Amino acid sequence: MLKKLIFFILIFKFTFVSAQLNQEPRNITKKFFSELNELENITPALKKKKGFTNYQELLNYIDEKVQNYPELVSSNFIGESQKGKKIPILHISKNSNYDIKKLRVWMQGGLHGNEPASTESLLYLIHLILEDPDYKYLLDKIDLVILPMANIDGFLKNDRYAANGLDLNRDHTKIMAPETRASKKAFAEFDPHIALDFHEYRPFRKDFAQLSSFGISNPYDVMFLHTGNLNVPENIRVIIDTLFVKNAKKSLDKLNLRHRHYIKSEKYKGEIHFSTGSNTARSSSNFYALNNGIATLFEIRGVGIGKTSFKRRINSGLAVGFSF
C-alpha cells in the first residue's frame, strides 16, 4: 500500500528556509505548478499583491453583489464568531422563495482559517454565476447558498483553528463552537440536496521530510474526501464517487490539474503510515452525507505556500464547484 501511494507522489528536492512563509522553491513552482492566469483580478485578494481577503473586504464584496443584483442575491448573518464578527451567508436564486423543482446546493469555505483559496474560489464563483453569461443558466436549475468564510476569527489570523483553539471540522457532532451551531442551523433550514466543502491542504508535511533523500511534496492540485461512513446509504456513497466526483475529475483533467482521493500520513510505532478516506461524523463530508445529501469535501494544494499559484488554486476550486 505504501509503495503504491508513494509511486503516485512526485518526488521533489526542497530546501527548508524557516524564515519564509512559502515552503516551495520557485523552480518547483515554475516546472510543476505554473500559474493559470486567465482569471481576472476581481475578487478582493486578487486585487492586491500581498495578503488575502479580510473581513471588511468580504462584507463590501457581498454588499456590492446584493446592490448590483437585488433580484438574484440576498445576504444575511447566521450568527457571530467567538470574537463577535457577524458571519455572512449569501442566497443566490431567481425566486424569492425556493423552488421545490430545483436542486438546493450548499457551498462553504474558510472553515479552516489558513486555507485562503477556499474562500477566494467561492467569491470568484459568485462573480461568474452573476456576471458571466456562460453560467447564468445554472440559476434555472439550482438555488444556491454560499457560506464563504465560516471561521472568520481563524481566517483573519491565518490560523486553522477557531478562537478557542477548536478545529471546526471536528465539531460536527459535539457542536461546541458558536460558529458550528450557526452553520448547522442555516444548513438545516436550507436542507440542501448537495453540499460541497472547499478546503486546502499542506503539500509539505513533517512526515514527508523523512521520505527519500531530500523529502517529498504532495503534487496533487486537488484531493477528494467524500464519505466512507457505512451508515450513509450505499446508493448515495456510490453516486457521489461514480457521478459527482468523476465529473469533477474530468473538469480538472481539462485544465491539466492533478487529482486523486484524499490521503494523509501519520506516525504509528515510529513508522509513517498512509491512509485514505474518512468515516467519522465529526467532519463535514460524512455529517452532511448522513443527512442523506450528496456531500463532498475537497482539498486544494495550498496551505503553507502563501500566494504561490493562487490563481491555479482558485481555478481548481472553480472546476470542482461548477462540475457539481
Regions found by a protein language model. Name each.
Residues 4-13:
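Sec-dependent N-terminal signal peptides
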